[in-house]
């Protein structure tokens, strides 16, 4: 009878060990997935829901989009330490995600209109760069802006950005600084995945 009890105990112990091994295997899988998702979200992608109409008709209120963090290089806050490596700079007409200059806890999404060192003028609903008589071609805007702005010279390390919905956008025309610095740019808007898939440009 002693050997029977001992045998039962061994079987029970093996069973418990097997169950714990399976639980640990699942736990490891979950940990790995969480780490990968966290790394992708913090290093590669920006996952955002659009809260306002400022980029209509290109991006609508409620759209869910991915931004690509590595489009211009690496700009990462790693446990309070900033890691930054620039590969390329934003170009005119790029739609960028950035820290709002007047409150860096907020992130904004707008279109790059003027580049570092350029002078921008918004007059009679059109945008002019560096005193050109020819206005920018902007087929993406919802409607022409009612108010004039400028001329304004963008600082050396800055970008002048506006929303596509020109009359309903809190953008560089309204801000205290009137520009986004290169270091505040987090990434480039990539594609919308909800309510339908669309490449953003």
Name each model-derived stretch.
Residues 2-4, 35, 124:
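Generic secretory/membrane-interface signal
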Residues 12-24, 39, 43-49, 56-201:
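Soluble "head" domains of membrane/secretory-pathway proteins
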């Amino acid at each position: 009878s002693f050997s029977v009890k001992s045998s039962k105990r061994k079987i029970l112990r093996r069973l418990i060990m097997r169950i714990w091994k399976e639980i640990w295997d699942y736990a490891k899988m979950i940990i790995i997935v969480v780490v990968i998702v966290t790394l992708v979200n913090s290093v590669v992608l920006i996952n955002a829901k659009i809260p306002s109409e400022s980029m209509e008709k290109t991006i609508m209120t409620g759209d869910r989009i991915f931004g690509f963090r590595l489009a211009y290089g690496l700009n990462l806050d790693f446990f309070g330490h900033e890691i930054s490596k620039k590969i390329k700079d934003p170009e005119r007409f790029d739609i960028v995600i950035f820290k709002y200059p007047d409150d860096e806890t907020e992130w904004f999404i707008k279109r790059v209109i003027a580049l570092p060192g350029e002078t921008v003028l918004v007059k009679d609903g059109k945008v002019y760069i560096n005193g050109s008589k020819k206005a920018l071609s902007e087929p993406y805007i919802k409607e022409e802006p009612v108010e004039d702005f400028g001329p304004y010279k963008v600082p050396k390390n800055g970008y002048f950005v506006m929303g596509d919905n020109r009359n309903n956008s809190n953008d560089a025309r309204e801000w205290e600084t009137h520009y986004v610095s290169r270091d505040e740019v987090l990434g480039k808007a990539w594609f919308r995945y909800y309510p339908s898939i669309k490449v953003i440009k």
